[in-house]
Design a protein with these regions (language model features):
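Helix-rich catalytic cores of soluble enzyme domains
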Residues: 1-129
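Conserved small/polar residues in nucleotide/adenosyl-binding loops
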Residues: 131-133
Length: 133
């Protein structure tokens, strides 16, 4: 699906956000560093394909969609502290490659409550401190 989108949008100068989304412990190594390395490889592969289709196409590096898997509860953790680490890694790798980076902020709460507010605040603090677009 991604390749089809890349093909259809190539040649129009549309910036492409390349997302790496390994799930630590499932589709990537269980460690944050290992999952970040897999996500980085995914992103670099997407950038190479896009640059072959349209040399000079603007790219956005996004490892912020990576998350971990809670093996005890058998569920993906999308609002845990590990997500802030992935956002920081995304920002630093974007700076390393001199590519704009992006990420996202999520929560584990199912309601608009204090937990949701606290987790979003931690996420936004991370983004406001480190990530530039």
């Amino acid at each position: 699906m991604s390749l089809e989108i890349f093909l259809r949008s190539a040649g129009h100068g549309i910036p492409a956000t390349i997302n790496g989304e390994p799930m630590a412990g499932v589709s990537g190594p269980v460690t944050i560093a290992g999952a970040a390395a897999v996500g980085n490889a995914e992103i670099l592969a997407g950038i190479v394909v896009n640059q072959l289709l349209e040399p000079g196409r603007p790219m956005i590096y996004n490892l912020g969609l990576a998350h971990v898997f809670d093996m005890k509860a058998a569920t993906a953790v999308t609002g845990g502290p590990e997500n802030a680490l992935f956002a920081q890694i995304s920002a630093e790798m974007g700076r390393f490659y001199n590519i704009p980076s992006s990420s996202w902020v999520s929560t584990e709460s199912c309601f608009t409550d204090q937990q949701a507010g606290l987790e979003k605040m931690f996420g936004f603090h991370t983004h406001l401190s480190l990530i530039h677009i």
